[in-house]
């Protein structure tokens, strides 16, 4: 994929001033809800807002924390804990494995732009 194609796929979703530390925000990109998190170190993470266990769009309302050195988000529904870097569920609360799609965050000054998860790129290029 060319740099030009990536530029066309990336979308500005907000400014860092629109985010609060350790408080989630939801953004709608096309028909997909994305949860954004600003961490105390200034990093921004973006994952699917869809809780794979409950089927509800609630991840942005979860509790930010850490497990070891991994920044995490705990679902407000059944309390599963996900790694914000990889989307992996670290604490399944007795359920089967699941994960959140992870969006690539690109900062351009104060603006936050998102690139879709790798598995979504072929679909977006075809549209």
Locations of the language-model features?
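Rieske [2Fe-2S] iron-sulfur-binding domain
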Residues: 26-127
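A boundary/linker detector
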Residues: 1-12, 16-17, 21, 117-127
């Amino acid at each position: 994929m060319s740099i030009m194609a990536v530029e066309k796929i990336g979308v500005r979703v907000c400014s860092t001033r629109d985010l609060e530390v350790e408080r989630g925000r939801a953004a709608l990109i096309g028909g997909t809800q994305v949860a954004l998190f600003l961490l105390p170190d200034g990093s921004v993470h973006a994952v699917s807002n869809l809780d794979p266990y409950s089927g509800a769009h609630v991840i942005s309302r979860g509790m930010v924390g850490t497990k070891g050195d991994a920044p995490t988000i705990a679902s407000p529904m059944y309390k599963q804990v996900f790694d914000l870097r990889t989307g992996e569920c670290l604490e399944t609360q007795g359920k089967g494995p699941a994960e959140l799609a992870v969006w690539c965050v690109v900062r351009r000054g104060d603006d936050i732009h998102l690139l879709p998860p790798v598995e979504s790129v072929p679909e977006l290029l075809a549209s």
